[in-house]
């Protein structure tokens, strides 16, 4: 009986160690990606200003590569000025301006930058947690704000 208890206890400890190692590896990958300014966040929820949160079913994502951003995100909300035909919304590539990163807590990184294209000017605020979870807030000059929840993905 004592042997069975010891065996079960040691299995639980092994699983805890493996989980802690995985969490530490994810945290290192997050930090390395942010330090290199090369990361992708896949979104699974959007929260329009004044609207209901909605699950996103397609492969929407935001990618930062150095001084450029590739935004492939859905947009639901009010737009105040649009080009003829409706425009591209939040589907664009652009040059990043005023990129900054701060660490308000030990498990959260806060990123801010601006992007201007021929349709609008956008302010991005991104919170990335050590577990890879992320919240993206986007404020457009000519559009209602929108937020997204997602997770950083690591490509092998």
Where are these regions (language model features)?
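Sec-dependent signal peptide recognition
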Residues: 1-2
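C-terminal motif of bacterial Sec signal peptides marking the signal peptidase cleavage site
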Residues: 7-10
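Bacterial signal peptide processing site
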Residues: 12-15
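N-terminal secretory signal peptides
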Residues: 20-83
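A generic structural signal for short beta-strands and their flanking turns/coil linkers
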Residues: 37-39, 58-60, 65-67, 88, ...
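Short, solvent-exposed secondary-structure boundary motifs
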Residues: 47-56, 87-93, 112-119
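A low-complexity, Ser/Thr/Gly/Pro-enriched, surface-exposed linker/loop concept
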Residues: 78-100
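Helix-rich interaction surfaces within compact, conserved domain-sized segments
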Residues: 94-156
């Amino acid at each position: 009986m004592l042997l069975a208890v010891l065996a079960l206890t040691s299995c639980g400890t092994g699983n805890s160690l493996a989980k802690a190692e995985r969490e530490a590896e994810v945290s290192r990958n997050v930090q390395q990606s942010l330090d290199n300014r090369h990361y992708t966040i896949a979104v699974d929820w959007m929260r329009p200003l004044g609207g209901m949160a909605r699950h996103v079913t397609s492969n929407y994502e935001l990618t930062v590569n150095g001084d450029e951003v590739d935004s492939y995100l859905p947009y639901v909300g009010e737009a105040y000025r649009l080009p003829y035909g409706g425009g591209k919304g939040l589907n664009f590539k652009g040059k990043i301006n005023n990129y900054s990163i701060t660490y308000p807590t030990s498990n959260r990184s806060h990123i801010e930058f601006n992007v201007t294209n021929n349709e609008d000017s956008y302010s991005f605020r991104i919170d990335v947690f050590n577990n890879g979870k992320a919240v993206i807030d986007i404020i457009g000059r000519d559009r209602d704000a929108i937020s997204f929840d997602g997770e950083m993905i690591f490509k092998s």
